[in-house]
Amino acid sequence: MRILGIDPGLRTTGFGVLERHGHQLVYVASGTIKSDGNADLPSRLKTLYDGVSELVRTYRPDCASIEKVFVNVNPQSTLLLGQARGAVICGLMSGNLPVFEYTALQLKQAVVGYGRANKDQVQDMVVRLLNLEGRPGTDAADALGVAICHAHGGETLAAMAGLAPQLARKGLRVRRGRLVG
């Protein structure tokens, strides 16, 4: 299975492509899509959409995983990130890809084993897990991390999160990937 991971951002969007063969992960590509900070917002969003659409055409992934938006201290920044994320998701959907979403906590838990890991720890583990010769930038590393998260059972986490309302009605919830009462 080929997975395209995305770390969305208005200025810089990271991407990472990997393949899962059984339990083995194989690095394919990573990098960033940059929008011109001097351009108007619609032009910047189009740059992201076009860039992601091109990644889908070039790498032909089976699915995509993307980091969920967090609420920033600055509401304006959160809104801009949400718009960038929307443009990215539309680019992914241009290829009719299934899109899976993960929180930063889920990503860090899957990659480092600790949900409060810092960016350096994520980068270091991405290098180790994918046997990379060089260290990817933080945006590309986060994108590879969200792809790793999906490859390591993220589908199960996403399905369990989708069941949360039904479980809550029965007095149950999912905590740390486990069903608790």
UniProtKB/Swiss-Prot annotation:
Source organism, top-level taxon: Bacteria
Keyword Cell membrane: no
Annotated Mg(2+) 1 binding sites: 7, 139
Cofactor(s) recorded in Swiss-Prot or TrEMBL: Mg(2+)
UniProt binding sites for Mg(2+) 2: 67
Name of this chain's protein: Crossover junction endodeoxyribonuclease RuvC
Cofactor note (record): Binds 2 Mg(2+) ion per subunit.
GO function terms (MF aspect): crossover junction DNA endonuclease activity; DNA binding; magnesium ion binding
Subunit (UniProt): Homodimer which binds Holliday junction (HJ) DNA. The HJ becomes 2-fold symmetrical on binding to RuvC with unstacked arms; it has a different conformation from HJ DNA in complex with RuvA. In the full resolvosome a probable DNA-RuvA(4)-RuvB(12)-RuvC(2) complex forms which resolves the HJ.
Family per record: Belongs to the RuvC family.
InterPro entries, A to Z: RNaseH-like_sf, RNaseH_sf, X-over_junc_endoDNase_Mg_BS, X-over_junc_endoDNase_RuvC
Active site per UniProt: 7, 67, 139
Keywords, alphabetical: Cytoplasm, DNA damage, DNA recombination, DNA repair, DNA-binding, Endonuclease, Hydrolase, Magnesium, Metal-binding, Nuclease
An example Gene Ontology CC term for this record: cytoplasm
Gene Ontology biological process terms from the UniProt entry: DNA recombination; DNA repair
Compartment(s) of residence: Cytoplasm
Coiled-coil positions: none
Purpose: The RuvA-RuvB-RuvC complex processes Holliday junction (HJ) DNA during genetic recombination and DNA repair. Endonuclease that resolves HJ intermediates. Cleaves cruciform DNA by making single-stranded nicks across the HJ at symmetrical positions within the homologous arms, yielding a 5'-phosphate and a 3'-hydroxyl group; requires a central core of homology in the junction. The consensus cleavage sequence is 5'-(A/T)TT(C/G)-3'. Cleavage occurs on the 3'-side of the TT dinucleotide at the point of strand exchange.
NCBIfam families: ruvC (TIGR00228)
Pfam family, one: RuvC
